Amino acid sequence: DKMASVIERHKEAFDEVRFSRAIHSLAPAENTAKTPVLLTTGEVDGDRKRLTRHDIIALKKAFDKAKIPAEGRILVLCADHVADLLEQDQKFAAQYYNYDSGAINRMYGFEVYEYDACPYYNTSTKKKLAYGAVPAAATDRQCSVAFSLKRAMKANGSTKTYLQEAASNPTTQENLFSMRTYTICLPTKSEGLGAIVSALKA
């Protein structure tokens, strides 16, 4: 069924926008004591430095110092950082991904997930780029995002779909489909958020 296939792809694209906006909202705006933005310290890989376990430990220390509750800590790794750990860390590779929960193995108190649309930061200022902004190759790199479930909230309203089939569309004789929803995902405080940004190569 071609119509059903198109609608399904539309729904997937719709969800992708929701998820990308949510992770952008949960990433800290800039580096502060309670919203640490760290840079990776690993070996150079192309135009950036790789993520290492030491970088995740540094983020844990920053959360501990900021007195962020240990329970409910989430770390969402971008695709580059997952690849870094898979290539460098045999233990991580052996425990990679739980097909039942969708989570990667737990690391240093963080429940770990993977998402390829994490935000970008300016590596000099450690400030987050606006949603949808095009990253500059000379200064901006992608991050992995950390947050505390105790410092975040989400609310999903109902989703309404609209469909007009070609047979009842005298203007263009095309099938028209659209969706509308109300959803929000935000930090409740400017704390308990963190990011590890790929550093520029030296």
Regions found by a protein language model. Give the residues of each.
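Alpha-helical scaffold segments that mediate packing/assembly in large oligomeric complexes
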Residues: 1-66, 197-202
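Structured, hydrophobic secondary-structure cores that serve as assembly/anchoring elements
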Residues: 1-2, 60-86
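Residue-level signal for secondary-structure boundary elements
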Residues: 18, 22, 34, 68-71, ...
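Short, catalytically relevant binding-site loops at active-site mouths
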Residues: 28, 80-84, 117-121
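Sequence/fold signature of self-assembling virion shell proteins
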Residues: 44-53, 88-202
